[in-house]
Amino acid sequence: MVIQTATTLSPAKARPSFPHNDLIKSMSDSLISRPTHPPIRKLKSSLKISHPEPISRSKSEIFCTSPEKNVRFAIELTTVKRFDKNAEPSSISNENSPTLSPVDSNTAADDVQLFNNEDCWFNDSSLVTNLLKNEKKFRYMNSLNNMFKLDLYDSEDEDDIDEHINSQAEYGYTYNSLSTRGKTSENKSATSSLATQATNICDWKLHCTDLVPFKIAPPLFTKTLSASDLQGQLTKYLNGQNVKLHSLTQLGDDSSKITGLVYVKNLSFEKYLEIKFTFNSWRDIHYVTANFNRTINSNVDEFKFTIDLNSLKYILLIKRIITMEKNTSSCPLNIELCCRYDVNNETYYDNNNGKNYHLFMTTFKKGGETKEKIPVVVEPASQTDAAMSPKEMKARFVSSNPTLSRFLPQSRKFSEDTDYYNTSPLKHLYHNDTTSWVKPKRLNVVLDKLENATPPPPSSALANDTARTGKITKDKNNVLAPPTASNSIDLPILGSQHQSLYSGSSSYSSSSSSISSSLSFASSNNSSTNSSSASCSFPLTELDNFDYANLYEPNDTFTTANLFNHSLNSLMPEISTPSFFGGFRNENTINNNDSKNLVTSLEDSYEDKQSVITDTTMDENNKTSTINNSTDTLIKPSKENGTVKENKSSANSTSAPSSSQNRASTILNDHSNGKSDLKYVNYQSLLDSHCFYNHPSSPNLQSTSFSSAAPFSGISQASDIFDYENEDSDSNQIAGEIDNNSFPPHFYLDEDDKSACLSDDALIDHHRNTNPFINTFSSSPPILSQEVDRWRL
């Protein structure tokens, strides 16, 4: 039952609200001599409040001075509700009733907060008196009847305002509208900053936990795990507990969610599982409920829960658990949790044996991720960079910066050491050799007349001419300077590395460089040669480790055409077999015993008793092979000695001398002769035309300088050196017919290391006398085909 107490205004405090009040007062003074109080309605005794009289009197006096109505809904209720007396009853409700504290921050600037809700009790007379004294401070700006309250704060109420300020000081509260408004603006800025920080949180990462997960051990003797084995493993893992957390993972698609799986014993059908977790050592506790996930067996069920960190980030920021400063991109976050299991009116906990479960995480904000720095390779400047074109410099810069290469048009690229396996005779036209030592000055240049090119002087580091007959030692420090002329390139040849004697990228017709050594070659009137390379000079090296295995066609048969083809495949297609020129002197020191020693050393070293050092094509990228798997350079010895003798006798009758002055006419003009006389070519005569003898003073093939050496001619890339075996002792008779003014160098075979050696004793050929070699090739030699590398018949 609602009891409403009527209030009346005292005469001293009564103020007219309308202009006609003065007229009414004058009329009442004239008619009524004594003012009378309005009648007061009496209440029933059952409705009266049982309070002491002093309190009632004080209350009546207060009610007379208050423009508000105080309503008490029941005796049990102690909270006083206040509302404006001018408000309509429909607006008075529990939701719209004004409270002692402002509802929002907008009203906090103008309203006065005196007490908390717990401080205002109905039975405390002092608090109620103080409350009613300061009722005038309550805000009326939003009231519907503000027009009648404009004169509320006049001069008569200044004393009440002073009393109000003093009362605030007694309770430790001072009202200042300016400071309150300043605090409100600060709160607004703090709220906006908090929202910005919460928005900047973009990622959560779970690093580790102290949870021991449950792992099913595979069976030992069966493929599938039986129910009894699973039950035994679960019982061992639970270790007598009714609830056990066995999994904590972070979702892959949403990093802000942590999911957990809990095993509980099936003690009853109705179960309640709750997860309690905290971020600040249990000062603040958060709860999440676990739901049923699946049934493991009749004794164990599994529950699942999810912790959404995004829903808690505002609380974490307010509590300063997460701090996102400007200079930081991440913040550590630690979580502690435990499980509570309610079943059969009993509660069980899983708190990791009293230690709780810990999760160690990290929070990241937007823009805090450090970008991966792409390393830029800075190479030291070299001499080649100075002469590099801008286009090449741009290509090198782009290749060392992956970010730039992504935006450039992609094309097929190969590394510099790529082996193309190109067997085309024209491959040097499309492939630029990147070798630092073998670098031609001019590509695709053919010199038809080599007479105009003069060879460079021999190196001073070579042996002197006076030591021709002695033992020549190898000069390991003989490395010539880089090339300075366009027609001269000095290159070292390293025998241990099996470096090819070709100084270009082509193995068929290189136009970059060739060897100009002390050996002089010329052509006769009938054998035409065409020089196709510039003259260069570099020292010869050991031939004992020369690599014969890198041939393009290892399956060729032992035919005369194939053998001759492989021996000359490094020459230009128009070049014929070279012949020696000049006078040859007779060496009296050569006898039949030397020939026998030569045959014996060859029999000990080679199974086929013959070996031909040929200028064959080689793969530039496969120079390290030391195994000779090729069958093209091996020549089976002739079993018939009569054939050799016939060739010698026939060659002596048809040989004609040639001179070095006829080199200008060595260009081949007619190929028909080579085609017609191909069937008469006997390759055995070529083998018998050069003799090699054993010499004890020349252990190795060494480079030396010869003052009487003629310019190199007729060979495109390397000197053709043929090492043959004499089948009989009659071949030494050829050396006896050589003139003493012949070309001095000679080839020997050392008995110790069975290697071909170059000496200065004699290089036997037959120009002045009958020469079977020239007789055999009296006509034009056959022409090599560039495409198929076969005889062109």
Swiss-Prot record:
Residues 649-665 have a biased composition (Low complexity). Residues 1-10, 623-633 have a biased composition (Polar residues). Keywords: Glycogen biosynthesis, Phosphoprotein. PANTHER family: PROTEIN PHOSPHATASE 1 REGULATORY SUBUNIT, SERINE_THREONINE-PROTEIN PHOSPHATASE 1 REGULATORY SUBUNIT GAC1-RELATED. Residues 235-360 form the CBM21 domain. Regulates the activity of glycogen synthase. It is most probably a regulatory subunit for protein phosphatase type 1. Residues 637-648 have a biased composition (Basic and acidic residues). This is Serine/threonine-protein phosphatase 1 regulatory subunit GAC1. GO terms for biological process: glycogen biosynthetic process; glycogen metabolic process; meiotic cell cycle; mitotic spindle assembly checkpoint signaling; regulation of glycogen biosynthetic process; response to heat.
